[in-house]
Swiss-Prot record:
Zn finger spans (SBP-type): 107-184
Provenance organism: Oryza sativa subsp. japonica
Protein name: Squamosa promoter-binding-like protein 13
Gene name per UniProt: SPL13
Residues annotated to bind Zn(2+) 2: C151, C154, H158, C170
A GO CC term assigned to this protein in UniProt: nucleus
Low complexity bias locations: 67-91
Motif window: Bipartite nuclear localization signal: 167-183
GO molecular function, one term: DNA binding
Subcellular location: Nucleus
Length: 216
């Protein structure tokens, strides 16, 4: 009976110790799961810092993109402003060149070389034909690199070979003018001859009583 009692005691003690060890293991496992599920306050504090640090490069990248876009826009605006300034400078230079005596802008100017007198205040004839009063009467002037003279009949410059001596009208216009004068003189003489003939015929028929025949 003593051996049976001892065996029972040993079994009960071993079973209780095993149960205690199992309970300890279960408690340890439960404690481990709870620690994994519920983070500590220090870990909670670290999380926003990690998130902020992870987002910092992204924000920096966005700022870099905006700064690069701003730099591109600034470069484009500066290039456009420089081109507008250059265009304004070219326009100013063109206006300055047009104001010179040899320029094509402004009012009419004398076409004689080394003259270029402004004819804005000159007479209508001089403005129309682009010649000053002095060079319109000069016997020899230089126009377009040629020795020429202003024709009073054509109102333009001709080379000296088209004039006779010191005449101020070209040979062709003088010939036409002389031809018209001769024709006009011939017509006048013919009319006078006809009129005298009519008068003579009338006087010859006065004694006969017949009316004179007249050509009208």
């Amino acid at each position: 009976m003593d051996r049976k009692d001892k065996a029972r005691k040993n079994f009960s003690s071993s079973s209780s110790s095993s149960a205690a060890s199992m309970a300890a293991l279960a408690a340890a496992a439960a404690a481990g799961d709870g620690g994994a599920a519920l983070p500590s306050p220090m870990e909670e504090d670290k999380k926003p810092r990690l998130v902020a640090s992870s987002l910092a490069p992204v924000a920096g990248g966005g700022g870099g993109g905006s700064s690069s876009s701003a730099a591109v826009a600034a470069g484009a605006s500066s290039s456009s402003s420089s081109s507008s300034v250059a265009a304004a400078a070219r326009r100013g230079a063109g206006r300055a060149g047009g104001g010179a005596p040899s320029g094509g802008g402004g009012g009419p100017r004398c076409q004689v070389e080394r003259c270029g007198v402004d004819l804005s205040e000159a007479g209508r004839y001089n403005r129309r034909h682009k010649v000053c009063q002095t060079h319109s009467k000069e016997p020899v002037v230089l126009v377009a690199g040629l020795r020429q003279r202003f024709c009073q009949q054509c109102s333009r410059f001709h080379e000296l070979t088209e004039f006779d001596d010191a005449k101020r009208s070209c040979r062709r216009r003088l010939a036409g003018h002389n031809e018209r004068r001769r024709k006009s003189a011939a017509d006048t003489a013919h009319g006078e001859n006809c009129r005298h003939a009519d008068q003579d015929a009338g006087r010859s028929h006065q004694g006969t009583g017949n009316p004179p025949f007249q050509i009208r």
